[in-house]
């Protein structure tokens, strides 16, 4: 078991944030793995895996670099730096940190990831490993993440809001629940980070950050370049309901009944969500979502309750009945049943 010792001040200052680089690295790890965690990820792999494999087939040094850097229990540190969590850190700025890695550091990190196995001779003296890694991540970003970034960002923001709401209502135990395998709050200033055996780390004075990603990937990272204060980060997968891009479409009958925006909100409220989460997931404005919620609540289709500092909305039994009715489809058509009669039948004149 590996754990971090975290002081009360470090934990109190911990926060959730977004990182385009973390999202792109998670996409790279998914392409490298080549298997899908859910149907939406399968469709994404079908669209991008052939081009990714063709790219590496034409570039053997980079293909070997990826195989050495992304190991089952350890990533090469230079490839997964702790994100800053700063709102103004865009993808090019984050990528520059990888590109600027000294070549000797990159080779040492690869050797560490190999856990005692020798670094392949083809990589042992290369000075372009950071540039190759950065170029590959840039390709993954431009080809597979950037075209879908607005939707991904809304999903990530919704996850951050959900975790923050849990933090407000149940503390860090609730906020960390189910975040990644092996991670849980042990108490006594200890955060278990993995079920694997790793030396304990002292995080006194460090910045503790949590970054969601939409692929089903997770890892840990921390600063090793001597910066002050150092950052330690947990990258974790969004909850499945938020991360899967293939949510069932809003039924046309529900759209005809309620209008498109209102129907989309009702469909999302099978599980409790806040107004801000709904804004993030639907892309609608705050005012529009607020009006839809008021109408649905007045109609008895949704109810609200307070959870800590957040107000959460969820479908009522009446709302569930409406959704079931429009998603079940029409009853099978057939000839009308004969009308039952009592006594003698009559014939019209």
Q: Which role does the model predict for each range below?
A:
Residues 175, 198-203, 221-226:
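A general structural signal for short secondary-structure junctions and capping/turn motifs
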Residues 211, 216-349:
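Extended mid-to-C-terminal alpha-helical interaction segments
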Residues 17, 192-194, 216, 258:
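Generic, ordered loop/turn and secondary-structure boundary motif
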Residues 185, 202-204, 213-215:
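A short catalytic or substrate-binding loop motif that flags glycine-/basic-rich loops and adjacent residues
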Residues 1-192, 199-201, 232:
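N-terminal, charged low-complexity regulatory/assembly segments
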